[in-house]
Amino acid sequence: MMTIFFNKTDLSRNDAEKIISETLNNCDDGELYLENSKSESILLDDGKIKNSTYSSDLGYGLRAVTGEVVAYSHSNEISKSSLKQSADNLSSTLKSKKGVYNHKIPKRNEQFYKNINPIEEKSLQSKLELLKEVNNYTRAKSGIVHQVTASFSGEHKSIEIIRSGGEVLTDVRPLIRFNVSVMLEKNGKKETGVYGIGGRQSYDEYL
């Protein structure tokens, strides 16, 4: 279980589980989907920082299914009043529908990647230094290098799914990307080559 969704709000885990169970009582399926997403990007163009961004988003989605009817509500505010409002909206949509909640879902507890946060494991300065090294190395290879653009992007998502009855499923999803674009110019002719690598891994693969 994760604490990040409940440590800065008036909504407790017990409150959330109670609201979910009451809302999904007469439904066939449904869940509360909580997500905390952080992302960053750094772009170096000809040795200068052209762009550097960071964002952090927190929110939830509440879904209920009865027969062929699917009701959904979402919000960027995780609070008791917000979740209660979403639950009321779903109950209103499904008020004439009755179903039996399916507690038996297939589970595959396989770890496909490490539980890491690539954004926080390395400093911004260390990432910039590597991008500068790429720029200097590439330009030293040939005098016809006209432009070098190198970038890092990283993402980290924490996800928790709470189903009726208090069943909890969690996942942490890291993601990084490293790109290099090089433009060569000779006798008035320009050509560009691009290469990129990445995946659900750590910046340690490159830094």
What are these regions (language model features)?
Residues M2-S21, N25-S41, S81-D171, S202-L207:
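Acidic low-complexity segments
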Residues D29, S39-S41, D57-G61, V65, ...:
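Broad gene-expression machinery/nucleic-acid interaction feature
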Residues S37, G67-V69, I78, E155-K157, ...:
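Generic structural motif
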Residues E40-K95:
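N-terminal alpha-helical targeting/anchoring segments
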Residues G47, G165-G166, N187-G188:
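Detector for glycine-centered tight turns/loop "hinges" at secondary-structure junctions
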Residues T53-T66, L169-G198:
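Short beta-strand elements
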Residues V69-A71, E110-I116, V194-R200:
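A short small-residue
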Residues N76-I78, Y195-D204:
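Short, solvent-exposed aromatic-acidic interface loops
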